[in-house]
Regions:
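A residue-level marker of the well-folded mature domains of exported/periplasmic proteins
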Residues: 2-7, 24-362
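Sec-dependent signal peptide hydrophobic core
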Residues: 5-17
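Bacterial Sec-type N-terminal signal peptides, specifically the leucine/valine-rich hydrophobic h-region
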Residues: 18-22
Length: 362
């Protein structure tokens, strides 16, 4: 079986991406009200995020975006979080448009339903940046910023398959706990993972698309499969750290042994701590600072009537895809700590101090 050689990205990757961040060339439209001037009313930028169950949005995406956009000019951010409710997000978008936002940065709850938000914005000549998740069924987007989401699934799948092989597990069986079926990114994670798993000797015992990315629903699913597949679960493909946490809770409650190999994504602090403790094998680290600041830079350019460059065409939409990185116990120091995403003190709380020392995380 072909093994994946992980190329560990450190802060240099983020710096490179930031350094090559879009340079603008003048568009045909006159610039909007000067957003670099401190005089006059602030230019409003809408930021619509999808949910709060994943900690990244409130802890990282929002504050990083707001700090960057305000450093670029006289901007006010009109912010809303939809709490995984597509109808609520539609209302929030209409409210932001009524409030006079000049650019809308949208991370959709439902990729298909969000096309109507884009249509409403277009009718008012407000450009939309599709952030992290691609709005489906429309080419009326000014820009799309995300990570290579199919590659995320490939990295997760390779990590799981390779670890099972390295551990000498014969005829391994796994559960697949995918993300929300209404999240376009989750579809790509699943596709990428299957492209690896389906070619391996790993058997998928059962598979579940987790509504709303709910850790509780992931836990319930895994708990049910433990009873059905007693002694057969060698691994769990969990699409993110939230669903991984649900899987871990179910497995611990059932005292499953030997412990399965469990994947994840988002490099949440709880996910990193589970990796340190040996409860989770890996996660996917995304340089959210780079992504959020890039979105702010593009929003600034669009607000000024400029045309962002340095993009590739994806389904008719100017796109910038960033690079995801595998994190295991062995490279925590070289990734999330070195990049300043977390400090050792944040990871190595009292509960995890001994595990951190054993893993040389200090």
């Amino acid at each position: 079986m072909k093994k994946l050689g992980y190329k560990l990205a450190t802060v240099a990757v983020g710096a490179l991406l930031t350094a090559t961040t879009l340079t603008a060339c003048g568009g045909n439209n006159p610039p909007a009200a000067s957003s670099n001037s401190s005089s006059g009313p602030a230019v409003k930028i809408g930021l619509l995020l999808p949910e709060t169950k994943t900690t990244r949005y409130e802890a990282f995406d929002r504050p990083l975006f707001e700090a960057k956009i305000k450093s670029l000019g006289n901007y006010d951010v009109v912010y809303s979080n939809a709490s995984q409710d597509a109808s609520k997000q539609q209302e929030q978008a209409e409210s932001a448009l009524t409030d006079g936002v000049k650019v809308l940065v949208l991370d959709p709850v439902n990729a298909q339903a969000a096309a109507s938000i884009v249509a409403s914005a277009k009718a008012q000549d407000v450009p939309v940046i599709s952030y992290d998740r691609l709005v489906a069924g429309t080419t009326d987007l000014a820009y799309y910023i995300s990570f290579d989401n199919e590659q995320v699934g490939v990295l997760q799948g390779n990590a799981l398959v390779d670890k099972l092989a390295k551990d000498g597990v014969k005829n391994p069986g796994i559960l697949m706990v995918n993300g929300s079926p209404t999240d376009g990114n989750a579809v790509l994670f699943k596709k990428g993972a299957h492209s690896v798993i389906d070619k391996s000797d790993v058997k998928v015992l059962a598979e579940y698309d987790t509504p709303d990315w709910s850790p509780d629903k992931a836990q319930s699913f895994v708990a049910g499969q433990i009873t059905q597949f007693t002694g057969q679960i060698d691994g769990v493909y969990a699409a993110n750290d939230g669903t991984a946490g649900g899987a871990v809770a179910a497995l611990k409650a059932a005292n499953v042994s030997p412990w399965p190999i469990i994947t994840g994504q988002d490099a949440e602090i709880t996910g990193i701590q589970r990796i340190v403790a040996g409860d989770q094998y890996m996660t996917i680290y995304k340089a959210i600072k780079t992504e959020a600041e890039l979105a702010a830079t593009v929003a600034d350019q669009l607000a000024k009537g400029e045309t962002p460059s340095d993009a590739t065409d994806v389904a008719g939409v100017p796109t910038k895809l960033l690079t995801p990185v595998v994190v295991t116990k062995e490279n925590i120091m070289d990734t999330v700590v070195k990049d300043g995403f977390y400090t050792v003190a944040q990871i190595c709380t009292t509960e995890y101090a001994k595990a951190c020392a054993a893993a040389n995380i200090k």
